[in-house]
From Swiss-Prot:
Presence of the UniProt keyword Calcium in the record: no
Membrane topology, as annotated: Multi-pass membrane protein
Disulfide bridge positions per record: none
GO biological process: seedling development
Family membership: Belongs to the SURF1 (TC 3.D.4.8) family.
Membrane-spanning parts: 55-75, 302-322, 338-358
Localization terms from the record: Mitochondrion inner membrane
Name of this protein: Surfeit locus protein 1-like
Organism: Arabidopsis thaliana
Length: 384
């Protein structure tokens, strides 16, 4: 009997030990499953807010790059200016005897007859001149053209003429011929002219000033030759950031300031300024070198990189729009967009951009807007 009871107790003890061991072995598996569930939850993508925000960001970048691409095509607005300049410059030069109604001339060439007063010439610069292999530093020589007495085809009032580009030796020789006394006298005359013209408020002073101009011309007729100048009416230059300030008292002129130049020569501030031009350059003529007519239309070609920049920015914009659209389509359809239509859209837009750029290939150039005189938009039918 005792043996039977002992056997029963042993079986109960062994069963309890087995149950405890099985429960302890199941604990790591439960912990592993909980870890896997937490990893899956953490790796699951947050829904729509992130995708919607990324799509808006791509759209913003797309609009920005498209705007940058359009800035390189802004010069197409200058087509009318280019056409009007070409038409005006191709016309036959007209005789200009008066300084009235200059705004109606545009870029039409004019012919002015008079006498050069080379003693009052002023050199503006330095101005570089591009050669075939290098560049040379020189100056623009500005000389007053005085009226011819008793000549009906002559100018009625003095004008300033930019005769063209000359080497630096011309200015050095001019200063040497003047000498120290000449420089002081020229500075005094400049200051005297400024004081005289600034005080021209009354009718008597204006009459006295106009009365003195013909006397100067008559004294110089015997030692001057009659000349005809063909050029374009221009205005003052806009100085750059690094351009030095003009010092009329020291005869130092770094940019074209027409009113100040006229005052320094003893004329009024409203004196007309003409830039001499040529169509066929005479090779036997050395200096001054007038400005080529073609340079009045286009002064400097823009590099080919601008075309590449336009294609680059528009292509970047197109890529951003496609990326943003694909994100929205995935959000709405919950599947990747496939098929032929998404491929045809970027190809068609790319073809449109390329054809647009090719049509504007002749307009990628800098328009000469510095020193432009009068009106550039001109109805040639109204020009007489």
């Amino acid at each position: 009997m005792t043996k039977l009871v002992s056997k029963i107790f042993k079986r109960l003890i062994s069963q309890s030990q087995y149950m405890s061991s099985s429960t302890t072995s199941n604990l790591p598996a439960a912990s592993q499953t909980s870890n896997l569930e937490s990893q899956l939850l953490s790796s699951a993508p947050p829904p729509a807010k992130k995708k919607r925000g990324s799509a808006l960001l791509w759209y913003l970048v797309g609009f920005t790059t498209y705007g940058l691409g359009e800035t390189y095509k802004f010069l197409q607005t200058q087509v009318e200016h280019l056409d009007s300049r070409k038409q005006c410059l191709e016309m036959k030069p007209m005789k200009l005897n008066t300084t009235k109604d200059l705004d109606g001339l545009g870029f039409r060439r004019v012919v002015c007859k008079g006498i050069f007063d080379e003693q009052r010439s002023i050199y503006v610069g330095p101005k570089p001149r591009s050669m075939s292999k290098s560049s040379e530093i020189g100056f623009y020589v500005i000389t007053p053209l005085l009226p011819i007495p008793n000549e009906p085809n002559s100018m009625k009032s003095p004008i300033l003429v930019n005769r063209g580009w000359v080497p630096s030796d011309w200015k050095e020789n001019s200063l040497e011929s003047l000498g120290t006394g000449g420089l002081v006298a020229a500075a005094k005359e400049s200051r005297k002219a400024n004081k005289l013209l600034s005080s021209q408020q009354s009718l008597l002073s204006k009459f006295w000033y106009k009365l003195n101009n013909p006397m100067i011309v008559e004294d110089q007729v015997s030692r001057a030759m009659h000349v005809e100048v063909v050029g374009v009416v221009r205005k003052s230059e806009t100085p750059g950031i690094y351009t030095l300030v003009n010092y009329p008292s020291s005869l130092a002129w770094f940019y074209l300031d027409v009113p100040k130049l006229a005052l320094a020569m003893g004329f009024g501030e409203d004196t007309m300024y003409i830039e001499s031009t040529y169509t066929d350059m005479d090779e036997s003529r050395t200096y001054p070198v007038p400005r080529d007519v073609e340079n009045l239309t286009r002064s400097k070609d823009i590099p080919l990189d601008y075309h590449l920049y336009t294609v680059l920015w528009h292509w970047s914009s197109l890529t951003c729009f496609i990326k943003a659209s694909s994100i929205l389509m995935r959000r709405l359809t919950k599947s990747d967009p496939i098929g032929v239509e998404p491929i045809l859209i970027p190809i068609s837009i790319l073809v449109f951009i390329c054809t647009k750029i090719y049509s504007l290939r002749n307009l990628f150039c800098k328009i000469d807007t510095i020193g432009v005189g009068c009106v550039t938009k001109l109805d040639t039918g109204k020009v007489k």
